[in-house]
Amino acid sequence: MSVLPTPLANQLLIALPALSDPTFSRSVALICQHDENGAMGVLVNRPSEYTLGEVLSQMGIDTVDEHLREQIVLSGGPVHPERGFVIHDDARDWDSSLEVGQGVYLTTSRDILEAMAAGEGPRNALVALGCAGWGAGQLEFELGENSWLTAPSDANVLFATALEDRWQTAAGRIGVDLFRLTDYSGHA
């Protein structure tokens, strides 16, 4: 029996410069679930090729909100790329929702998108297609290999920081300048 280290739900996972996998290089993921069976998160700084207007249209949801239609949908990760994930700050009882922690929620049901289209959705929301997943012990191994940093989730990083700045800003919240780190890591 292994003992699970502190669960990482509601943490930001920040790729270190040495992580060369193109899917995760310079990425920031919000860890939404983490237990002895593995972890699930959503990348929050990878734009997809889609706008929210295109996604809503494909779902048969109309909106007149031009800003909402132009919102970039994130590429949340390589797992279930056809599935939508909404990270937001609205505690309402959506059909399929999980409290990630400290006023941050993950919803996968259509009702939140319908509310957003009607102008009745969360004040702050990120919409992503796909997520990232780690098998049992995989994330812990990658952390031990110095592929990632962790930092507490931060609404400012999630909702008020430009996509292209989230990687550096998330690390800066814990005092790390990623541009001063080498691409090599080791163990003492």
Swiss-Prot record:
Q: Which residues form a coiled coil?
A: none
Instruction: Output the Gene3D superfamilies linked to this UniProt entry.
Output: VC0467-like
Q: Name one GO cellular component term.
A: cytosol
Pfam families assigned:
DUF179 (PF02622)
Recorded hits in InterPro entries, A to Z, give: AlgH-like
- Give the signal peptide range: none
Write down the superkingdom of origin.
Answer: Bacteria
Q: What family classification does the UniProt entry report for this protein?
A: Belongs to the UPF0301 (AlgH) family.
What's the protein called, per UniProt? UPF0301 protein XAC2918
Gene source species: Xanthomonas axonopodis pv. citri (strain 306)
In the record, what lineage is assigned to the organism producing the protein? Bacteria, Pseudomonadati, Pseudomonadota, Gammaproteobacteria, Lysobacterales
